[in-house]
């Protein structure tokens, strides 16, 4: 007992002797060897990922070259299966084009781009950060690095202990930062002032030019985008429910002949959606059963016609290889589909006794064959599918019929909700009317969504009609967000515990296994483990914020992405930068600020230079880790090896996976690089070497995303915001500008350079005024209404692009739009044609045999180049 108390007392004393500073400050004084070793280890791991990716990209085309498989990339015209060397030349050609794309900061957006405007602007954001930091590195590094490095390290004793405590360096690495400045070199701070002003001016020049670019580009993209002539209205006057004539009269004064069709949301729509989900599952099951029947017949018939495999190759070893491969494929098929058959062949049934009023168990052996059982299941599925189709069509027909009923307010409010979709005959008029309705009076409870993509709508939140329940969810989500931001100090505090491993291992015997004896490994672990742990901790949070945005009742995925971006940026900036920099916990920050509210500049001036080594490592390691993960896609690779390789998926399922295996949720991607950009801005003067590291890091990430968009990404971005995420990301960089100005304000004060402090205070005030004006301009200016200058430059042909088609009830309200057409793979034995003929006569089903073909081993391959 006494030993336990003594151990606890020693441990607490050990930690109590340590200052309560941020975990990033423990990297102050790290040797140059330790810094380079951590970077080198991460770079070697990135090279390993890159090498593995180059080897695997030709073997797993569905993961790494989906666009080549889908025939939508120009390089797909080459037969990659016959000449695998072409894969490597294709990659080298892509690498050859990459520097030119990176050096062109004003690369234009092509309207036929598959990945949409938001994804294009994200690539532009990465390129913009590269260009922004490259210019700063060219100017700041040659000036500031010599000033920092050759400043005197030894301070005179009578010049004050506060400078010695705050700025004395312990390694060559710290000599590259402002930590190496002494009071005698305070005259050189004028260079830091001018360069910081240049950073602010350069940022505002980039910001203003990009805002103008996004506004011009957004208008041109809107003209050709689908669903942009639709308005969603909620809380409209109940007197207008079911009165299409009244609505048309309401909008007539705005513009003659602008009104299209009104679709009120019926209250039974939730029931329709449930039936559609069941119908979609039945359609997938039906296609899967038919596919299994074809495979069953194929493997039986090929076993009889073995010469098809034996004669496929001339040489003996080739014949043996084909035979073994066929037997392996057949074994996989049998283990996957016949186990369930034999499990249901013998059943236990309860039979009533003819003598006593009791039931007794009796074994029942199912005598039907595998094919008979599958045909019986298929017949049952088709009958159930027809019944659900009839129910869905009846409900839709009822809703569509009642849309055209005479005005009956009492019955209308019972049938419909106070929510509707209105289609207009022009995108421009729809956007203008939507913006006018958005500027409602405070007493009105009208909610407007302009141009919602019907595939992006979250119907559960739209169909939620209880005001009390919606308010409860909204306030609960906001409270939980605050708890997540504040309560995440526990995982971040764990990061501080990791950095205390040497202290723990010296006191607790069993923890010595994690205390490395090798000095080199210890330096690598000290530099690398906290960074990797911080990356993992930060990556978990977006899932919480996405769920909380859904809980708030947001009605489209685009709204959720914008909401997640704002909150996740706040979280990442606080925990990745503020908490890690200033202290090991959010509560300690509050405590220090409450005790001395005016100490913010001095606090930053003391702590920021000490954390320069940590963030220099973090920026580069984060970029390499993100780029390597983007290319290798380890999760998809593991699923391919251990799940899809053993699963016989239908052609429709394989095609859907090709199109949807890669998608980006930009709301949780933008904040990561916005915060890294803020860190680069903050340390652009304090530790200018970070500017070069930011360029390298963002270039690697840009390379990985460029490859994904060119060779892999082909999914339509339903959650398109038309540049809103990009504008928010640019405005979030102001956080880096403010913290840089605060830090320099504190540094100038600590060096008794009050003239420089006054100038920096004026710069800070001008930054706040400029930021306020730009924010007001963005909020007050309607983002979807073109300027008069843009409209005056439109030709008659381009004006016609504003005209949009009308949408039916099914187009808007259906959540499952799968075709009834069944895809079957065409085989050389003609089994698919036989099955098609039989099922068309028996059940009047529709088939397509031109999309996929089946090889000799039962594997399906895409044949057609059409995207569905």
From Swiss-Prot:
Superkingdom of origin: Eukaryota
UniProt gene name: SPO75
GO BP of this protein: ascospore formation; ascospore wall assembly
Keyword Iron tagged: no
Subcellular location(s) of the protein: Membrane
Extracellular face of the membrane: 1-34, 149-187, 503-527, 591-611, 684-692, 752-753
Keywords, in A-Z order: Calcium, Glycoprotein, Ion channel, Ion transport, Membrane, Sporulation, Transmembrane, Transmembrane helix, Transport
Protein name: Sporulation-specific protein 75
Membrane-crossing residue ranges in chain numbering: 35-55, 128-148, 188-208, 482-502, 528-548, 570-590, 612-632, 661-683, 693-713, 731-751, 754-774
């Amino acid at each position: 007992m006494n030993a336990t108390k003594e151990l606890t007392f020693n441990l607490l004393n050990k930690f109590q002797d340590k200052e309560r500073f941020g975990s990033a400050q423990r990297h102050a004084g790290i040797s140059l060897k330790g810094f380079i070793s951590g970077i080198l280890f991460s770079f070697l791991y990135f090279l390993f990922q890159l090498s593995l990716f180059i080897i695997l990209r030709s073997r797993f085309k569905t993961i790494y070259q989906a666009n080549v498989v889908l025939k939508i990339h120009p390089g797909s015209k080459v037969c990659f299966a016959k000449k695998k060397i072409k894969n490597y030349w294709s990659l080298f050609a892509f690498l050859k084009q990459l520097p030119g794309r990176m050096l062109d900061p004003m690369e234009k957006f092509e309207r036929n781009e598959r990945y949409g405007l938001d994804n294009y602007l994200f690539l532009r954001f990465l390129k913009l950060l590269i260009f922004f930091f490259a210019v700063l590195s060219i100017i700041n590094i040659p000036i500031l690095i010599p000033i920092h490095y050759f400043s005197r390290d030894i301070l005179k004793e009578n010049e004050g202990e506060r400078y010695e405590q705050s700025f004395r360096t312990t390694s060559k690495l710290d000599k590259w930062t402002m930590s190496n400045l002494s009071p005698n070199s305070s005259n050189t701070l004028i260079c830091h002032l001018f360069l910081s002003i240049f950073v602010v001016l350069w940022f505002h020049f980039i910001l203003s030019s990009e805002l103008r670019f996004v506004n011009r580009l957004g208008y041109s993209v809107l003209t050709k985008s689908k669903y942009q002539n639709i308005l969603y209205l909620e809380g409209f006057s109940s007197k207008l429910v079911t009165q299409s004539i009244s609505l048309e009269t309401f909008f007539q004064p705005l513009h003659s002949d602008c009104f299209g069709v009104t679709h009120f949301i019926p209250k039974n729509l939730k029931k329709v959606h449930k039936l559609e989900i069941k119908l979609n599952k039945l359609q997938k099951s039906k296609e899967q059963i038919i596919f299994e029947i074809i495979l069953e017949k194929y493997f039986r018939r090929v076993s009889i016609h073995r010469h098809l495999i034996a004669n496929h190759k001339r040489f003996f070893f080739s014949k043996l290889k084909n035979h073994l491969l066929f037997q392996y494929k057949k074994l996989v098929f049998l283990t996957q589909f016949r186990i369930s058959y034999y499990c249901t062949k013998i059943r236990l049934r309860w039979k009533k006794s003819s003598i006593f009023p009791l039931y007794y168990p009796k074994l029942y052996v199912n005598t039907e064959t595998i094919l008979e059982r599958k045909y019986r299941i298929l017949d049952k599925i088709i009958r159930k599918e027809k019944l659900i189709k009839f129910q869905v069509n009846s409900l839709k027909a009822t809703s569509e019929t009642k849309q055209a009923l005479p005005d009956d307010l009492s019955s209308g409010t019972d049938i419909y909700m106070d929510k509707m979709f209105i289609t207009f005959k022009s995108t421009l008029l729809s956007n203008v009317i939507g913006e006018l309705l958005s500027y409602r009076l405070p007493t009105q409870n009208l909610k407007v969504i302009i141009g919602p993509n019907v595939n992006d709508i979250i119907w559960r939140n739209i169909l939620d009609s209880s005001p009390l329940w919606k308010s409860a969810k909204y306030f609960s989500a906001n409270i939980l967000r605050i708890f997540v931001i504040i309560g995440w100090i526990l995982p971040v505090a764990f990061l501080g515990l990791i950095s205390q491993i040497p202290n723990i291992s010296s006191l607790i015997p069993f923890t010595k296994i994690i205390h490395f004896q090798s000095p080199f490994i210890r330096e690598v672990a000290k530099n690398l483990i906290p960074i990797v742990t911080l990356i993992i901790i930060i990556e978990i949070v977006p899932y919480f914020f996405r769920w909380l945005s859904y809980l708030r009742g947001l009605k489209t995925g685009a709204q959720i992405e914008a909401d997640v971006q704002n909150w996740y940026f706040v979280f990442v900036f606080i925990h990745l930068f503020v908490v890690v920099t200033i202290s090991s916990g959010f509560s300690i920050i509050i405590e220090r600020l409450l005790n001395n509210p005016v100490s913010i500049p001095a606090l930053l001036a003391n702590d920021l230079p000490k954390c320069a080594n940590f963030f220099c490592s973090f920026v580069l390691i984060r970029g390499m880790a993100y780029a390597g993960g983007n290319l290798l896609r380890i999760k998809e690779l593991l699923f391919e090896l251990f799940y899809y390789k053993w699963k016989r998926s239908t052609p429709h399922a394989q095609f859907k996976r090709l199109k949807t295996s890669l998608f980006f949720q930009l709301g949780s991607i933008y904040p990561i690089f916005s915060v890294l950009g803020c860190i680069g801005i903050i340390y652009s003067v304090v530790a200018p070497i970070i500017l070069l590291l930011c360029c390298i890091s963002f270039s690697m990430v840009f390379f990985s995303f460029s490859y994904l968009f060119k060779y892999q990404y082909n999914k339509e971005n339903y959650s398109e915001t038309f540049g809103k995420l990009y504008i928010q990301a640019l405005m979030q960089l102001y956080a880096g500008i403010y913290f840089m100005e605060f830090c320099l304000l504190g540094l100038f004060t600590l060096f008794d350079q009050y003239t420089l402090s006054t100038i920096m205070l004026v710069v800070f005030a001008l930054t706040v005024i400029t930021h306020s004006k730009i924010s007001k301009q963005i909020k007050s200016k309607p983002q979807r209404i073109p300027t008069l200058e843009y409209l005056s430059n439109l030709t008659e042909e381009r004006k016609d692009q504003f005209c949009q088609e009308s949408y039916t009830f099914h187009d808007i309200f259906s959540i499952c739009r799968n075709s009834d057409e069944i895809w079957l793979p065409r085989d050389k034995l003609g089994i698919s044609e036989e099955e098609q003929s039989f099922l068309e006569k028996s059940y009047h089903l529709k088939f397509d045999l031109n999309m996929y073909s089946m090889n000799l081993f039962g594997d399906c391959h895409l044949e057609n180049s059409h995207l569905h």
